[in-house]
Amino acid sequence: MKTLRRLATLAAAAGAAAVTAVGLAPAASAAPDPVLASPYLYQWGGQTSASAAMSATDVKAFTLAFMLSDGGCTPKWDGTRALTGSDATMINQIRSAGGDVIPSFGGWSGTKLGAKCTSASALAGAYQKVIDAYQLKAIDLDIENTDEFENAAVQDRILNAVKLTKQKNPGLRVVITIGTETTGPNTWGKRLINQAKAIGANVDVWSVMPFDFSNGGDMAAHTKSAVDGLKNQLKTTFGWNDDVAYRHSGLSSMNGKTDNAGETVTVANFKAIRDYAAGHHLARFTFWATNRDCSGGGECSGISQGKYDFTKIVAGYTG
């Protein structure tokens, strides 16, 4: 499914180096909302400089990928790097420049905390270590790997851990990011949403990844249809009206060529998606990833585009 994410994470695991501890600055009280407009950024390839992206685009927040299991229930960046070191340094740099971050747990590749932590309380404890380490305002749970997504017991463990984490951190916002069909969440996605309601997990934002559908088509239209489907499921589950459901919805697109041959999100597509998101006041508008936000192949988007074209579009999103 998410081949580009898979390859990147495997590369990180192979090349991770030891890091040294640094002090971490807390999120500034006037810092931007890390949920709303925060493109994904990772440390293992492509354009990894948060400072360069902020200077070039005026983007103020990043979704940092990925927090994984070290083989047990201990959270580490890409499953290898401690919570101190280069990642903490980057968070300090982002905050010093007036920005903020939202770490993402999960992704496609690597060992997942949801699967390795044997209870909801243990998983909540793993989340708490990261929240405390970075004094976070929000976390993103990217539940796309089958070990977590297509597993009822793990889905419930994650949702119960969210409930416990929200109780301990009343101001924390939790985003759950899942894959989608063009019509909205599939059976497993619908189950996850319904279980969140049943458990009382109090998820703040539900975000779908509207790509890897097929081998082409109008990606702006596919994205709108997928998010409309998410909105409809939230209406059904929670009894919200359209406006409230949209304001609990979000999307995480992909710039340029996706993992599926022939499927491409162009800059024009992404602008249309931005306009749709703004028109419905979506709570989250992002993409994978600033690292790839450059022209051509290799570790770039695979299309002809200006450097940081997609990040600039996200930077201008105000909800």
Question: How does the language model describe each region?
Answer:
Residues 74-82, 147-241, 248-265, 303-305:
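Substrate-binding surface in catalytic domains of secreted glycosidases
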Residues 56, 60, 133-134, 144-145, ...:
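Outer-membrane beta-barrel proteins
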